[in-house]
Amino acid sequence: MLPFVHEQIGTIIVNFFILTVVCAITLVVCLAILTAIRLCVQCASGVNTLLFVPAFYIYNTGRNAYFKFQENRPPFPPEDWV
């Protein structure tokens, strides 16, 4: 075999190896970014579940109780009681 054929085969093998390594590194970086985004979404969901949902429930319950008891107010005491 001619010597330049060995050089071309070696160059093809090295280029294929470099391309494979670059693709693997790109894949790992993309997976890391997607994992970080997923973690942020899970944290936001946890904050919503643990903080905002109970706050809305307490606010709505108190508001409904306030309006309910506004309609059923007891009468004022007579003036001679004061």
Curated annotation (Swiss-Prot):
Record's bilayer topology term: Single-pass type III membrane protein
Gene, per the UniProt record: E
One Pfam family hit: CoV_E
Location, primary (coarse class): host cell
Species assigned in the record: Bat coronavirus HKU4
Function: Plays a central role in virus morphogenesis and assembly. Acts as a viroporin and self-assembles in host membranes forming pentameric protein-lipid pores that allow ion transport. Also plays a role in the induction of apoptosis.
Virion surface topological domain: 1-16
Matches recorded under HAMAP family: BETA_CORONA_E
Family of the protein in this entry: Belongs to the betacoronaviruses E protein family.
Membrane-crossing residue ranges in chain numbering: 17-37
Name of the protein: Envelope small membrane protein
Subunit composition and interactions: Homopentamer. Interacts with membrane protein M in the budding compartment of the host cell, which is located between endoplasmic reticulum and the Golgi complex. Interacts with Nucleoprotein.
One cellular component (GO) term of this entry: host cell Golgi membrane
Intravirion side: 38-78
GO biological process, one term: viral budding from Golgi membrane
Subcellular location: Host Golgi apparatus membrane
Lineage: Viruses, Riboviria, Orthornavirae, Pisuviricota, Pisoniviricetes
CDD domains recorded: MERS-CoV-like_E (cd21533)
Gene3D superfamilies (alphabetical): 6.10.250.1810
Keywords associated with the record: Apoptosis, Host Golgi apparatus, Host membrane, Membrane, Transmembrane, Transmembrane helix
